């Protein structure tokens, strides 16, 4: 068996081999002899089946198994020559050539290896930045919102028209072109005016109504509305206002603080303000990270950390982009690409740069996670999916199973690792204002 190897770079290599017919024949003989011990053939006792019978009954399978064994030998010898461990390979080896003739098989195997990434100066690529400053006014505004959320609605002491901030107790019945639609009606529904709970224009038209008043409210569902049957449609709602309630203002004092800090040792108003300030700082920092610093840091790493990329991983990423593009194309456009290989390749090339950046970013994050000792286990992924599902009013178990069955869990886990590792690196560079 002749073998020739070529290590293209640290992430890609190629193995070329000539497998003599004698090697395949020897493999067939060996596999057939082993089968004589286990094969069940009618008319023969187990373990007593002649090799000639085995070859006749399992002919094509024997050839396939013999060729597969020869390919494994090619791969093992090639890796030994390249001094590459099997564990360093990424994905399955790609057999790009398999030409059979009477006396030999000519084979070319392309392999991809986990790239070598130098992270020696990664911490120096992060510029120190100042922690967001929270003003006293921001703390007081949040404190007032907290107090407002604790207020209770009570019936009006003196009758008046409904205004923003009131809870309007209404019956409503919606129709489109005179036809009632599902989910468009309710009785004695408590609607807080100004909460934007209903579609734009509805609450504004309840403002000014008086108890006992009936009114037809006209609105238009937004084009982006969740129900396709309602999106962009004009609708009319028959509304009856039964009652108006106003919110009783909660005093911001030590008693209020004690209620909000129940279970804590320090129940003072001063501590409540301190905790609100800390919460606002964390929110501002998270916003800064998510909207600016994380993406900028990853872009810096992609630009400055250079290493060889496994070709087949880049091609897979291009395939994803191409499939996404194809889903937006017409049948004629897709047909044209199928019939014109040059045009298809030209389109693939438009995705190459972004694909390379995406693959590079993935390997960098993986290497950084190892360096920073960051990991996300399956339980963390489940908790994240459960939390987001509950936030959206969905069944957490069904949401998790949906992602799992669709094969999305690894991508979610990788996204969480990215978020965690970049946050950890950025946290080490915060400067107090």
UniProtKB/Swiss-Prot annotation:
Keyword Mitochondrion: no
InterPro entries: PPIase_dom_sf, PPIase_FKBP_dom, Trig_fac, Trigger_fac_C, Trigger_fac_C_sf, Trigger_fac_ribosome-bd_bac, Trigger_fac_ribosome-bd_sf, Trigger_fact/SurA_dom_sf
Cross-referenced Gene3D superfamilies: 3.10.50.40, Trigger factor ribosome-binding domain, Trigger factor, C-terminal domain
A GO term from the CC aspect: cytoplasm
Sequence ranges assigned to domain PPIase FKBP-type in this UniProt record: 165-250
Broad class of enzyme this protein falls into: isomerase
Cellular localisation: Cytoplasm
Annotated GO biological process: cell division; protein folding; protein transport
HAMAP family: Trigger_factor_Tig
Free-text note regarding domains: Consists of 3 domains; the N-terminus binds the ribosome, the middle domain has PPIase activity, while the C-terminus has intrinsic chaperone activity on its own.
Protein's job: Involved in protein export. Acts as a chaperone by maintaining the newly synthesized protein in an open conformation. Functions as a peptidyl-prolyl cis-trans isomerase.
Protein name (record): Trigger factor
Organism: Sulfurimonas denitrificans (strain ATCC 33889 / DSM 1251)
Lineage: Bacteria, Pseudomonadati, Campylobacterota, Epsilonproteobacteria, Campylobacterales
Protein's gene: tig
